[in-house]
Regions:
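Generic protein-terminus/edge-of-domain signal
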Residues: 1-66, 71, 87, 112-114
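A generic short alpha-helical patch detector that favors 3-5-residue windows
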Residues: 19, 95-98, 118-122
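Amphipathic, well-ordered alpha-helical segments in soluble domains
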Residues: 23-26, 47-50, 99-102, 122-128
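Ligand-binding loop in jelly-roll beta-barrel domains
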Residues: 78-102
Length: 132
């Protein structure tokens, strides 16, 4: 476990195996930081995040999605995206970055193209994953 320059606690670092059915590449917690901003072009993982508190935004293409406490979202691999914390009320979020054929098939089967956002409390699931 370590902290990076974005004030994120990295709790798991996996290995990239392009032939794997399912891989957890990275998992962690982003703590409140009004300057937090991530830009990903052709994102190389599937991103799953849960907003524990605060607010932020996600830009995909020409659309902006605002997220807040109690929201879950996932981003498809290969998209260009920007996500950032609110200046006034920066978020804390838990996240996991996944890859593999199984994740790709789930996105395809459930038509989860590009970005899926839902107001659903999945914090206990993220806590359980992070505790493993």
């Amino acid at each position: 476990m370590y902290f990076n320059t974005y004030n994120e606690k990295i709790i798991y670092v996996g290995k990239n195996d392009p032939y794997s059915l399912f891989s957890c590449m990275l998992a962690g917690v982003t703590y409140k930081n009004p300057n937090y901003r991530i830009v990903r072009n052709n994102c190389d993982v599937y991103v799953f995040e849960y907003v524990v508190s605060g607010k932020g935004s996600i830009e995909v293409g020409d659309r902006v999605y605002d997220v807040h406490e109690g929201m879950f979202y996932c981003l498809e691999k290969g998209v260009d995206e920007v996500h950032y914390a609110s200046q006034d009320e920066p978020y804390e979020k838990m996240w996991i970055n996944l890859d593999g054929e199984l994740v790709r098939k789930i996105f395809s089967f459930f038509n989860l193209s590009t970005l899926y956002v839902a107001e659903v409390n999945v914090m206990n699931i993220f806590i359980e994953i992070h505790d493993k």
